[in-house]
């Protein structure tokens, strides 16, 4: 009994403490005035008049959604020449993501998986990088994770409120970044496939209403996105210098799993080993629990990598290390269920040994 009491207290401490730890750790990264090139671009966009901001984004690769949010938040924080407010918005969206892990993942799965979800998120270097990055990736991570979790919630027990949350989260995601749009599209395809395979006919109406609404709301910017992509293909000089190589793939792994100074070979090997071991546990969890939700989530991320690879090999190199980041919440869920299954299997074997 004493052991169970101590163990329960430990899980409760982790469940309540990890979001606080994330806020303290990631919050430290926003207390700086240093900006890299893309962050400086975001800062310059915030200083523009509203009409000029919209006009420039029409010729850029991204919609004005993030820059509008950033401009509003920056001025609410007092503006000025200090950049902490720009970074703080990313930190707050990352905190929102952690709270999704704390409450929503716990509701849909259990507290143990929720703790593992938050723990892996806190330990992955890419999360610390993007938490202090004045770009749209933290915002996209929040909205795409909410999209995925609300979809599973709808699958379990559909309500009008859940469909509204799912639709709004999807709109927020597609307006964040082009690759967030791609990931949302792929997730919708997989979600529809699950609806058909599982004969969930009662979900088809809500699915198409949501999909049509997202498409309608995004349609003004879809034309801009397609035009930009066509122009990039048309005026590409065909140089292989801009195409992805094996080193590019290794660099993506390094960005996800390590700090800048870590030797790239070690990072790739250990990162892939971690992924394989946890994937083995996750597949076992899916089979034992007859629940493919984490597999659908991870499949979305994997398909995004394939799409990015094709674009990188045929058009020009995509920076998939950060472009795929909005889907990292799906990967963390996959890791969480995998680790939960591995620990459960280990405990089961220990009981047999000592029985």
Positions of the model-derived regions?
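Membrane-interfacial, low-structure loops and terminal tails that flank and connect transmembrane helices
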Residues: 1-10, 285-289, 348
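Membrane-proximal helix-loop-helix interfaces that form the catalytic/acceptor-binding platform
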Residues: 13-344, 354-355
């Amino acid at each position: 009994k004493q052991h169970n009491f101590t163990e329960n207290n430990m899980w409760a401490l982790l469940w309540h403490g990890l979001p606080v730890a994330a806020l303290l750790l990631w919050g430290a990264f926003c207390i700086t005035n240093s900006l890299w090139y893309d962050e400086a671009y975001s800062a310059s966009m915030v200083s523009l008049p509203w009409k000029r901001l919209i006009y420039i984004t029409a010729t850029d690769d991204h919609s004005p959604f993030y820059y509008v949010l950033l401009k509003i938040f920056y001025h609410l924080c007092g503006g000025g020449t200090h950049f902490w407010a720009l970074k703080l918005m990313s930190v707050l969206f990352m905190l929102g993501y952690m709270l999704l892990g704390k409450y929503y993942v716990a509701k849909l799965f259990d507290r143990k998986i929720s703790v593992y979800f938050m723990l892996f998120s806190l330990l992955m270097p890419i999360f610390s990088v993007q938490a202090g990055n004045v770009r749209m990736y933290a915002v996209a991570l929040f909205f795409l994770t909410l999209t995925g979790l609300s979809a599973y919630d709808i699958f379990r027990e559909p309500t009008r409120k859940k469909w509204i949350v799912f639709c709004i989260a999807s709109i927020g995601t597609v307006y964040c970044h082009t690759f967030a749009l791609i990931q949302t599209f792929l997730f919708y395809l997989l979600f529809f496939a699950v609806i058909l395979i599982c004969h969930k006919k009662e979900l088809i109406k809500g699915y198409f209403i949501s999909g049509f609404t997202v498409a309608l709301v995004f349609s003004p910017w879809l034309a801009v996105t397609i035009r930009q992509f066509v122009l990039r293909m048309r005026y590409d000089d065909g140089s292989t210098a801009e195409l992805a190589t094996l080193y590019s793939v290794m660099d993506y792994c390094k960005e996800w799993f390590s700090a800048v100074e870590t030797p790239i070979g070690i990072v790739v090997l250990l990162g892939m080993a971690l992924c394989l071991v946890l994937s083995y546990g996750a597949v076992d969890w899916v089979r034992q629990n007859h629940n493919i939700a984490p597999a659908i989530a991870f499949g979305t991320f994997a398909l995004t990598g394939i799409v990015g690879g094709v674009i990188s090999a045929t058009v020009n190199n995509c920076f998939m290390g950060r472009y795929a980041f909005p889907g990292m919440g799906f990967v963390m869920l996959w890791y969480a269920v995998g680790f939960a299954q591995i620990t459960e299997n280990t405990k089961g074997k220990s009981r047999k040994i000592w029985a």
